[in-house]
């Protein structure tokens, strides 16, 4: 291209000082607090006296609490009784939701993600938060065959949720709870129809900047 007379390319360059990008990232990574009860922070943040203090090293994984969907799922978890509830965190990302579920008394807990980075990061974060009841798996909804849960948390996206909805319903115990997020307000009708047509009952929802987190019971 450089030798082709039909192309004219102008460019400039400059030297920049060597930068510690981890340090720069840390400067811009802020801890968050949800409903005055749950504090989510990175390892370099000071610990607080929050009722639930979660330490997350996100690396390449989704789930620091900053995104609207994670924030709303935390809200759902905070107002739900998880004591001795067998729980599934589907599409666990950093395992932040599984960690909070254990802090609220859930056990045992399965955390599943199809992404290898998320799988490894979830193991690290579970250990970092001294979790004893979380088992992390790399895979998809095919791992759910024969499983049964009292509570299922699935923060993924519209298409995957719709595709896997029957598996969620099949492994949800009677009177079990299904939390869904990862989609927009305009997706509520199709998500709700998929759930109710399979025997679930709508309970409530949170909305935040056009994102939604729904709660259903079986």
Regions found by a protein language model. Give the residues of each.
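N-terminal auxiliary segments of SAM/dcSAM-dependent transferases
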Residues: 1-48
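Conserved beta-strand segments of alpha/beta enzyme cores
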Residues: 10-12, 39, 108, 133-135, ...
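Hydrophobic residues in well-ordered beta-strands that form the structural core
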Residues: 41-42, 111, 180
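Active-site beta-alpha loop architecture of Rossmann-like, nucleotide-cofactor-dependent enzymes
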Residues: 47, 63, 159
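A short, charged helix-loop
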Residues: 52-58
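Conserved SAM/SAH cofactor-binding pocket of Class I
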Residues: 60, 64-145
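S-adenosylmethionine
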Residues: 114-218
